[in-house]
Curated annotation (Swiss-Prot):
PANTHER family: DEK DOMAIN-CONTAINING CHROMATIN-ASSOCIATED PROTEIN 3, DEK PROTEIN. Residues 475-484 have a biased composition (Basic residues). It comes from Arabidopsis thaliana (Mouse-ear cress). A motif (Nuclear localization signal 1) lies at residues 284-291. Highly expressed in young seedlings. This is DEK domain-containing chromatin-associated protein 3. Residues 485-496, 606-615, 650-660 have a biased composition (Low complexity). Residues 676-731 form the DEK-C domain. Keywords: Chromatin regulator, Coiled coil, DNA-binding, Nucleus, Stress response, Transcription, Transcription regulation. GO terms for molecular function: chromatin binding; DNA binding; histone binding. It is found in: Nucleus; Nucleus, Nucleolus. Residues 694-708, 723-727 bind DNA. Residues 11-20 have a biased composition (Polar residues).
Length: 763
């Protein structure tokens, strides 16, 4: 490698010699220029100056020449310094070339065959050749930049030489001028015309000299460019030879390398390349000692990589499995399952403490509604079939865990998913009073949610009577004095049978809705007429009772009279309410047996309910009217008090007088319409009509029309009595059907041999 570097230095030496040649040529030319100036001086000695202005110009020229001399000296010094710098740069590039060559040798030594990865030696050689070419291109670029710097330096030198020529010319002119001054005396007598001719000749000669000098400059520049190109060619040839030799050496070294190389050495070579790239980017000037420092760093890096590549602790030794313990998860699941049906205490009363709810839940045989209710009450938890009723009866209000809003929204969503009919069933079980026709689904949900949040008794409860019985007694308050033939025992027996016919009655409601829609408008008109008729009847009864009381019942104190009357009224209202419940239940059973009879029964029940509400008003009016009369009469005469006592005593005695009063009603009605048919005739006609009529389509108005056709009379004023007759007939039919059903059930039970079913029916 040392011989190659010497060969590369030779062209630089040639360059220096070639650069010195133009200076020698310039010196010869300057000598020639001096001879020309001497000849010109001789010619000028022959001429005479006209004015003293020439002296001033000469002085100025002298001063300029001095300044130019100084500037030329400074520029020469600068040029010398630049040439020295260029020489130093050339030497530095040589050193860098040597360092790169050594690095390339080291890289070639470090690279080996990659037998594991399937990479051949030829591939590695190709890669190295490509890298060497890239390095050569970089070197060529650097050398071109250096050559351009050299050419610039040559141009500067040429410019300095031109300045020197001009300075020499100025010196020559000075010498000529001094000669002219000495010979002024001799040339004064000569003619002025000769002076002008000489001046013209001198100007022409100066122009010729300047042209010659320009040509000489152009020739010099051409010679310089030729020399620079020759030097470049020589440098390129030397570079190519060096690169070829280096590539050959690298190939030889790679072939000599052993095939059993390790992966650690490959990593070292890769790190070397990265370090070289970073160092080449950071600084172009690089000494030979840096390679050793880079190797130390590379070794440190390889050691760190080896440490990282060391096998870590095996996966089985890690304590990951301790976090996943199946036993704990199973224990948690068992605990949750055990807590499923623990009913927590809420803010309200227990449902078992509310008598109506408790009775309905215990009587409920179809557990579908209860199964749907259970997850709503207990946060989506489904209980066992045997525990559903006990859990529901133990419910006392929602217990919120966590966010109350989210829990409330979930409960409302569950209620919204249910149909309207199921919500009605929930309200029936929980004894929440809702009118099915008018209330919307949203209103039902809000009422249910409010009740379930804090369960409470929805009505007044007295003794063992339930809320439902209390409501029914309030509806039947108008019939205190209208006794029925049915006994209270019938109510209990009918209540036992009501459970059987509930499903059938629910199905019948759908059929009845159509008929009810037609009869709603008529029922309102009928209510008004009935109210008027009942008011008239009540007035007549009061007048008759007053007359009877006047005839002979002993006087009693005013204070004692009202107390027993109120208690007896309560007893009578309870009895009548039981009778009405039996009638309604019988009507529902009939509808279960036949859908046709169900439609009629519902129509009549609706009418009866319509009847029951206005008589409450009448009784209130009646009682208030009586009190007013007693207050007024107590001041005027003692007869009024005796009348009042007499009117209250028959109520104390027994319910028999009320029955007699009820019997008097049809007699009075018959008396009013003497020409009209009697109740017996109407009953017979109604029975025949009911046998013919299709219950799915027929309504109460249709029956009235048929009766009107038979009797050829307008029976609208007797609507109430006709309704009562129809209801009685329907209840009879229902009782007959129930008896048949009972017989069938008993026969089935006897066949099955199960006695438990009978107990459930009694319960």
């Amino acid at each position: 490698m040392g011989e190659d570097t010497k060969a590369t230095i030779e062209p630089t030496a040639n360059k220096t010699t070639s650069l010195e040649k133009p200076s020698e040529a310039m010196a010869g030319k300057e000598n020639a220029g001096g001879k020309e100036t001497q000849e010109l001086a001789k010619d000028e000695d022959m001429a005479e100056p006209d004015n003293m202005e020439i002296d001033a110009q000469i002085k100025k020229d002298d001063e300029k020449a001095e300044t130019e001399d100084k500037e030329s000296e400074v520029k020469k010094n600068e040029d010398n310094a630049e040439t020295q710098k260029m020489e130093e740069k050339v030497e530095v590039t040589k050193d860098e070339g040597q360092a790169e060559a050594t690095n390339m040798d080291e890289d070639a030594d470090g690279k080996k065959e990659q037998t594991d990865d399937g990479v051949s030696v030829e591939d590695t050689v190709m890669k190295e050749n490509v890298e060497s070419k890239d390095n050569n291109y970089a070197k060529d670029d650097e050398k071109e930049t250096k050559e351009t710097d050299i050419t610039e330096a040559d141009h500067k030198k040429a410019g300095k030489e031109d300045i020197q020529h001009e300075a020499d010319k100025a010196n020559g002119t000075k010498d000529g001028n001094t000669g002219d001054i000495k010979e002024e005396g001799t040339l004064v007598d000569e003619d002025k015309g000769t002076d002008m001719d000489e001046k013209v000749e001198n100007g022409d000669e100066n122009k010729q000299v300047e042209n010659v000098e320009g040509k000489e400059k152009e020739d010099k520049e051409e010679n310089k460019t030729k020399e620079v190109e020759a030097a470049k060619a020589e440098v390129d040839e030397s570079k190519v030879e060096d690169e070829k030799e280096g590539s050959e050496d690298e190939n030889d070294n790679e072939k000599v390398e052993s095939k059993d190389a390790k992966e650690d050495e490959k990593e070292e070579t890769n790190d070397d390349k990265e370090d070289e790239k970073e160092e080449s980017k950071g600084s172009k000037k690089r000494g030979k000692g840096t390679s050793s420092g880079g190797k130390v760093r590379e070794k440190n890096k390889t050691e760190e990589v080896k440490k990282d590549a060391e096998p870590r602790t095996p996966f089985s030794d890690r304590p990951v499995r301790e976090r996943k313990s199946v036993e704990r998860l199973v224990a948690l699941i068992d605990k949750d399952s055990s807590k499923e049906f623990r009913v927590e205490k809420g803010r309200g009363a227990y449902l078992k403490d509310i008598p109506n709810v408790a009775n309905k839940v215990m009587r409920k045989r179809s557990d579908e509604t209860l199964k749907l209710l259970h997850p709503i009450l207990f946060g989506g938890r489904r209980g066992k079939a045997a525990q559903i009723k006990t859990n529901i009866l133990g419910f006392s209000g929602f217990v919120w865990h966590g966010d109350e809003k989210k829990a409330k929204e979930k409960v409302k969503e569950k209620l919204e998913k249910c149909t309207k009919e199921k919500l009605w069933e929930f309200c029936d079980v929980l004894d929440i009073h809702i009118t099915k026709a008018t209330t919307k689904k949203e209103d039902i949900i809000t009422k249910l949610f409010e009740f379930l949040e804090k369960p409470h008794v929805t009505g007044d409860v007295t003794g063992d009577t339930t809320v439902s019985e209390k409501e029914k007694s309030s509806k039947g308050a108008k019939r205190k004095r209208t006794p029925k033939k049915t006994s209270p025992t019938a109510g209990s027996s009918s209540s036992k049978r009501s459970a059987k016919s509930q499903k059938k009655s629910e199905e019948a409601t759908k059929v009845v809705k159509k008929s009810l829609a037609h009869s709603d408008d008529e029922s309102e008109e009928e209510k008004e007429e009935e109210e008027k008729q009942e008011e008239e009847k009540a007035e007549e009864k009061e007048e008759k009772k007053e007359e009877e009381n006047e005839n002979g019942i002993p006087d009693k104190s005013e204070d004692e009279a009202p107390q027993p009357s109120e208690s007896e009224e309560k007893d009578e209202s309870e009895e009548h309410s039981e009778e009405e419940t039996t009638k309604k239940k019988r009507g529902s059973r009939l509808s279960a047996g036949k859908k046709e009879s169900a439609g009629r029964a519902r129509n009549k029940k609706a009418v009866v309910a319509a009847k029951s509400s206005p008589p409450e008003k009448i009784t209130q009016k009646r009682s208030s009217a009586k009190r007013k009369k007693t207050d007024d009469d107590s001041d005027t005469s003692p007869k009024a008090s005796s009348k009042r006592k007499k009117s209250e005593n028959p109520i104390k005695a027994s319910p028999a007088p009320s029955k007699s009063a009820s019997k008097e009603k049809p007699v009075k009605r018959a008396g009013k319409g003497k020409d009209k048919p009697s109740d017996k005739v109407l009953k017979n006609a109604i029975v025949e009509i009911l046998k013919r009529v299709d219950f799915s389509t027929a309504t109460f108005t249709d029956i009235l029309k048929e009766l009107a056709k038979e009797f050829t009379e307008d029976l609208t004023p007797r609507k109430s009595s006709i309704k009562m007759i129809i209801q009685e007939e329907l209840t009879k039919l229902a009782d007959e059907e129930e008896e048949e059903e009972k017989k069938e059930e008993d026969s089935e039970k006897e066949e099955a041999g199960g006695s438990g079913g009978g107990e459930e029916v009694k319960a």
